[in-house]
Amino acid sequence: MEVREISLAATTPLATDYINGTFPIEKGFSYSLQAEDVFWRRLDDIKGRAYPRRELVEYLRSYHQRFHASSETFYNIEKLLHPESVVVVGGQQAGLLTGPLYTIYKIISVIKLAKEQERKLGVPVVPLFWIAGEDHDIAEVNHVYIAEDGKIKKYVYPDIPQEKRMVSDVPLDHQVCSTWITNIVKTYGETETTNKLLDFLFQCLDQSKTFVDFFASIVLRLFASEGLVVLNAADVPLRAIESSFFTALIECHREVTDAVLRKQHQLRQLGYKNTLDIQPHCANLFYYDGRQRWLLEHDPQKEVFHSKKGEFVFSKDELIQLAKTKPGHLSNNVVTRPLMQEFLLPTLAFVAGPGEIAYWAELKEAFSIFGFKMPPVIPRVNITIVERSIQTDLAEIGIDIMDVFKGRLEEAKQQWLAQQTRYPLEEMFAKAKAEIEEIHRPLREFGMEIDRGLAGLLTKNATLLQAQIDFLHQTLQRALIRKYEVELRKFSRVEMSLMPNQAPQERIWNIFYYINKYGFDFLEKLLQLDYKWNGMHKIVYI
């Protein structure tokens, strides 16, 4: 594998400016990416903090035993008992088969940064992945994209409940899921890895009752030798550890909301669009009734917390009592999840995607309410994999990969096609249509002088003539495409691989396509690459 770095804008302007060093750091973050001592400073800032280390380790031991996690993972869990140990954390929803590639890249980023900083700082650093099991947006995680008959298809897991159930509580039907997996892997083609891959996935499925179980089982096996630790944010035993901070979030709900709204206003004044949809009445917590999450709002007149349509109503004391006795009924939203993470974990760094970078900037003042400093926010690695066959296609059609990323592939294809004939078709047909119109116009005028009632017929006749020219143009264009079908297919293959659906590769394709084709050591090779935390896009040639 070879790596080439290129500069590409992030998907949000704020993330682009943050990565490039042009965002005013103090306006949205506590640490600068450009500071060489950023991790030493962070280590110093959190060394006096108290964390629920023993409770967390007991929970993590129990959770990982369910998945028969590796000895390396249990070794890393025990590290958390060390008073100076810290974590590098990143998180994502529990996509089926791990979802798009960027989830895998985020895990790789967490692992690589943890190893690097353990070596540099001389303290234990644990790679931890926060699974957003409390999320209820099933449509985000219930599918995988596949390539079939030259087209991109969204292949959806069919057995989904209708309620807004937390992903961690969405059950998997093993028979339905086995068929779903088999059909996906079939589209990858038969290789010497295929049977091993199916066995791997079915073993993970056997350990799993829910979407989150399946995700956790897969990533713990894929990264077993790296000692990855995972945390299911929706797990009831974890909620017991979070109980006291839920109480703090209830007590300070208004201050949190006001802090976010103020920060959003400041960022708008700097020219950045807000990412979070938050209103003054938001309580930033959900109530979970066991089947559905209900976002809570606060009514200052009645001094109650309630779901939008009043299905559930709580006084402040009732909600605090719930946090103390039944914390499993409470769930964080996008604002309070990072705060809960900071309460739980001695976080050296948070590995983030571009969207997360943008919305975390809106949370800086919310962190300070609880005496926290936002951890260093480190952009995850962005990767595009270029297979050897795609590299060959690019060379043969004479296209630079930047043309693909800049959305110029279709334009390049049309230019290439135009160069294959000595006749400039577009110009010829445009000229023909103009000349026919010039000839026909005086005929229409003459007809109108004879009988103005012929206006409709004369116009229709002109339209038919132009339509015939268009028909001939399209016929010749199709013939040209047929003649160069082999060459044009190369453009399609390049687009399908590198920018499917005009989206970055890492947002569409799944890691198991590549594992099926190149073997399980494909992931090990990705892990062995030297990644620089500079925000540059990595093109990996294989």
Swiss-Prot record:
Keywords of this entry: Coiled coil, Ligase
Q: Which NCBIfam families match?
A: thiol_BshC
Q: What is known about what this protein does?
A: Involved in bacillithiol (BSH) biosynthesis. May catalyze the last step of the pathway, the addition of cysteine to glucosamine malate (GlcN-Mal) to generate BSH.
Instruction: Please state the Enzyme Commission number of this protein.
Output: 6.-.-.-
Q: Which stretches are annotated as coiled coil?
A: 458-479
Protein name as it appears in the record = Putative cysteine ligase BshC
- GO: which molecular function terms? ligase activity
Q: Does the keyword Ligase apply?
A: yes
Tell me the enzyme class.
Answer: ligase
Query: Pfam families, from UniProt?
Result: CC_BshC, Rossmann-like_BshC
Task: List the InterPro entries.
Answer: Bacillithiol_biosynth_BshC (IPR011199), CC_BshC (IPR055399), Rossmann-like_BshC (IPR055398)
Superkingdom of this protein's organism: Bacteria
Q: Which organism is it from?
A: Geobacillus sp. (strain WCH70)
User: What family name appears in the similarity comment?
Assistant: Belongs to the BshC family.
